[in-house]
């Protein structure tokens, strides 16, 4: 079936067997969606966020976290409305496809693809740091640890949706229990003034340690707050993955908004507690945490000593594992949706004949993320790569996320303006102003991210990926499109109700 003249795209007829080989199973309710959203993010409360102390000090980190929370509130309320109105696995790509056409949908999906392929790679570097610290493995063997963890958690996601969601629920609850245990443990061991405020500014403008504390809340001023925004993103990054579970949700129009909003409320409370307590523990401090790959473990060690370091390390690993597991889930669905519609090679969207999970998409996505890690590792050398790979990958993931957020917020605004006829079971209380705030904060965050010296190293890989996939879509993909649920909805201008295949 050809498109009208001038569109430059062609839809190919497929038979019922095409969608039969790409079937998904409905399982998730509100609780499962909540666990999926919180689990995807929770690793950011265990590692990554703390690098912001080096650019903003404690007060800069707190205020940056608040600004980023506003951005995510605007985003999550927007996608809560869109996911109920367009309950398709495509999520960001689906929203942008309906609002901005095929190329808009493709580029939005590509931005989100960078986020979900690279974020597991970031998390596994933190996991490896914890494992090396606990077991005493020489960091030179880190690639082996990466491969082992990817293999285990891709397999868990492949062998059944119900198993995947049950694992997600269990490790998310354990992760939150670990954080609550740490909060309760930390409160009697706090010295906020001496340790949280122990960062000053040296002659070269870099952070220096104040042994007696008592420093400024904002040692780098307001510019330090803005420079800390990319690190604060790690406190909430990936909550937006929930709409990718739309076709595996029992009632996405009702449950998806509830799951997203409950997840965001949980994360805001946890983020505030960890930013307040982790650097305030006696013997830790903001300065030490500003370069730590295992901040929560540092806090637990300071409270309980080294005698139980193995047990404490295993406990501290849970949050990282929760996010690693759930983002591999999201990665598979994101690749699956673009492939099912023909934007990516269509073979990637075939689901497992028994378990009905997008196993090909998850395996290929994991292989790409792992390949990027190995290329960086061997091109830089083990010693240099060990100290920079986490930051390089984090910049790649955050840049992809920011572009995706801008596109999703723009899609929300356009759909509010141009598609008033679409049924909206849920409406964002923040409306268009919330979406505008998301765009503004995301643009500012990108602007300050560019100043990170590791940004250029990471963004070059992102540009290469964009060039390769844009060439594929321009030359091949757009001539092999399929009327998937996302495409059918967009083609009809939102008039065709969603139909499950």
Region roles according to the model:
Residues 134, 173-211, 233, 275-282, ...:
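Hydrophobic alpha-helical segments and their helix-loop junctions in multi-pass secondary transporters
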Residues 1-62, 72-77, 88-89, 437, ...:
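Membrane-interface "cap" regions at the ends of multi-pass membrane proteins
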Residues 23, 348-359, 402-454, 487:
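C-terminal membrane-solvent junction of multi-pass transporters and transport-like membrane proteins
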Residues 28-47, 68, 207-281, 306-330:
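Hydrophobic, membrane-embedded alpha-helices of multi-pass small-molecule transporters
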Residues 391, 396, 400-401, 430-501:
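A generic transmembrane alpha-helix motif of multi-pass inner-membrane proteins
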Residues 142-202, 237, 260-265, 398-407, ...:
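Membrane-interface loop-to-helix entry segments
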Residues 94, 101, 132-137, 201-215, ...:
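TM-loop-TM module centered on a large, flexible mid-protein loop between adjacent transmembrane helices
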Residues 46-141, 263-269, 273, 458-467:
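Extracellular loop-to-transmembrane helix junctions
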């Amino acid at each position: 079936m050809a498109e009208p003249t001038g569109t430059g795209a062609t839809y190919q007829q497929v038979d019922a067997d095409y969608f039969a080989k790409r079937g998904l199973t409905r399982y998730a309710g509100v609780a499962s969606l909540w666990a999926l959203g919180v689990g995807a993010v929770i690793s950011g409360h265990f590692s990554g966020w703390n690098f912001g102390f080096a650019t903003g000090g404690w007060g800069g980190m707190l205020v940056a976290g608040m600004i980023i929370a506003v951005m995510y509130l605007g985003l999550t309320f927007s996608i809560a409305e869109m996911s109920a109105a367009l309950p398709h696995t495509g999520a960001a790509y689906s929203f942008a496809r309906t609002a901005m056409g095929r190329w808009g949908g493709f580029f939005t999906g590509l931005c989100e693809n960078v986020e979900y392929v690279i974020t597991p790679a970031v998390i596994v570097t933190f996991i490896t740091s914890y494992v090396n610290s606990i077991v005493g493995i020489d960091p030179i063997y880190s690639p082996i640890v990466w491969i082992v963890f990817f293999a285990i958690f891709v397999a868990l996601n492949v062998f059944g949706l119900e198993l995947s969601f049950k694992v997600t629920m269990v490790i998310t609850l354990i992760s939150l229990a670990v954080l609550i245990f740490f909060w309760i443990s930390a409160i009697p061991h706090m010295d906020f003034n001496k340790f949280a405020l122990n960062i000053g500014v040296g002659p070269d403008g870099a952070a220096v340690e104040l042994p007696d504390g008592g420093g400024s809340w904002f040692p780098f001023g307001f510019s330090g707050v803005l420079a800390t925004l990319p690190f604060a993103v790690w406190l909430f990054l990936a909550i937006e993955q929930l709409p990718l579970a739309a076709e595996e949700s029992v009632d996405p129009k009702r449950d998806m908004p509830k799951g997203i909003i409950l997840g965001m409320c949980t994360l805001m409370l946890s983020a505030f507690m960890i930013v307040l307590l982790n650097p305030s523990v006696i013997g830790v401090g903001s300065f030490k945490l500003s370069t730590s790959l295992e901040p929560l473990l540092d806090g637990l060690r300071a409270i309980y000593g080294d005698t139980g370091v193995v047990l404490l390390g295993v406990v501290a690993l849970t949050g990282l594992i929760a996010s690693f597991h759930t983002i591999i889930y999201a990665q598979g669905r994101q690749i699956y949706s673009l492939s099912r519609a023909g934007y990516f090679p269509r073979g990637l969207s075939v689901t497992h004949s028994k378990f009905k999970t997008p196993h090909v998409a998850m395996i290929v996505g994991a292989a790409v993320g792992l390949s990027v890690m190995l290329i960086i590792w061997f091109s830089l050398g083990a010693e240099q790569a060990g100290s920079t790979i986490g930051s390089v990958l984090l910049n790649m993931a955050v840049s992809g996320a920011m572009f995706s957020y801008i596109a999703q917020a723009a899609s929300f605004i356009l759909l509010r303006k141009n598609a008033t006829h679409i049924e909206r079971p849920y409406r964002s209380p923040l409306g268009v102003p919330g979406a505008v705030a998301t765009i503004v904060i995301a643009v500012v965050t990108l602007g300050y991210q560019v100043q990170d010296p590791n940004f250029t190293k990471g963004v070059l890989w992102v540009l290469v990926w964009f060039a390769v996939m844009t060439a594929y879509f321009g030359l091949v993909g757009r001539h092999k499109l399929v009327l998937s649920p996302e495409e059918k909805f967009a083609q009809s201008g939102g008039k065709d109700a969603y139909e499950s295949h």
